[in-house]
């Protein structure tokens, strides 16, 4: 969910540094598998899904890289919901593997700014590890374009996802895949627009198809945002359908899309990407879905 040029980077850095000051990240994880107050469901011999994978690789975009969660216009993978080591997040990898094994047996191949068409390259990298589980969170950048006309078509989105899974299956046929739904971008607009600084950052080119003229509520602006919303919902339908055809793939059932991100879960740098708190909520959702009996 990132799209800025060098001039925008400089402008955002000056703006956010002046208002907030740069913050850091806690990169120390817990030493035991699973969150403190969370108990895994009892194993079931009838399920083909392994709820305790021994290694994890992550693919996707800036959300999985922890972009803007720790400081302005910077990736912060230590707070990634999928593979981060921060105790403030308690990532999926740490919950499943514990701190020590997560550091040795989890890899983050996500790239900020990636769209679905870029996922095959990341999957090829992940496949070389033959991980027990690959996490996928991609699609926001396909909707976040300069205009609604420039959004990735549903057909191309489907082809990109199918190709990415095909690449993985050729090299790692037994690897399981957890697919997170694309977040409800329109809700992020609704929450973020309440912050004056956030709207100033948005003017510098963040997700123009949705966030341009953030305060405009006329028919044209409403129709534009509805178009983005409908495309995101179509992307999620594709993720569900394609994943259902792979017996080792598990879609989150729209859990990320349905999650009601509030201002505490949004980056205080751009009011659009997940904050550290938001990353923790994504980790909770993923852990619940990966360890679910069904």
Give the predicted meaning of each segment.
Residues 114-124:
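Structural motif
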Residues 65, 115, 186:
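Flexible, glycine-rich phosphate/dinucleotide-binding loops
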Residues 29, 33-107, 126:
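Serine-esterase "nucleophile elbow" of acetyl-processing enzymes
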Residues 72-76, 269-294:
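C-terminal or late-domain output modules
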Residues 21-24:
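C-terminal motif of bacterial Sec signal peptides marking the signal peptidase cleavage site
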Residues 123-268, 276, 287-291:
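Alpha-helical cap/lid subdomain in secreted, periplasmic
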Residues 1-17, 231:
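N-terminal export and membrane-targeting signals
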């Amino acid at each position: 969910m990132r799209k800025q040029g060098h001039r925008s980077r400089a402008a955002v850095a000056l703006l956010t540094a002046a208002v907030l000051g740069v913050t850091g990240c806690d990169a120390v994880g817990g030493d035991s598998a699973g969150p403190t107050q969370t108990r895994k469901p009892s194993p079931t011999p009838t399920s083909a899904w392994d709820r305790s994978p021994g290694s994890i690789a992550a693919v996707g975009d800036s959300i999985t890289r922890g972009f803007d969660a720790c400081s302005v216009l910077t990736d912060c993978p230590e707070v990634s919901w999928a593979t981060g080591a921060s105790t403030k997040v308690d990532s999926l990898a740490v919950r499943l593997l514990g701190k020590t094994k997560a550091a040795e047996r989890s890899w983050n191949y996500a790239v900020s700014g990636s769209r679905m068409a870029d996922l095959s390259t990341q999957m090829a990298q992940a496949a070389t590890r033959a991980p027990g589980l690959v996490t996928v969170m991609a699609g926001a950048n396909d909707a976040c374009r300069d205009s609604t006309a420039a959004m990735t078509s549903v057909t191309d989105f489907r082809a990109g996802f199918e190709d990415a899974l095909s690449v993985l299956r050729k090299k790692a046929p037994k690897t399981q895949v957890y697919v997170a739904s694309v977040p409800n971008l329109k809700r992020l607009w609704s929450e973020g627009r309440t912050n004056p600084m956030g709207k100033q950052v948005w003017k510098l080119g963040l997700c123009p198809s949705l966030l341009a003229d953030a305060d405009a509520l006329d028919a044209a602006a409403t129709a534009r945002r509805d178009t983005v919303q409908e495309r995101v919902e179509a992307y999620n339908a594709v993720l569900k359908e394609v994943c259902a055809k792979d017996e080792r793939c598990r879609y989150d059932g729209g859990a990320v899309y349905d999650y009601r991100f509030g201002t505490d879960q949004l980056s205080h740098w751009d009011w659009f990407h997940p904050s550290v708190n938001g990353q923790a909520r994504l980790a909770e959702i993923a852990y619940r879905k990966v360890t679910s009996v069904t």
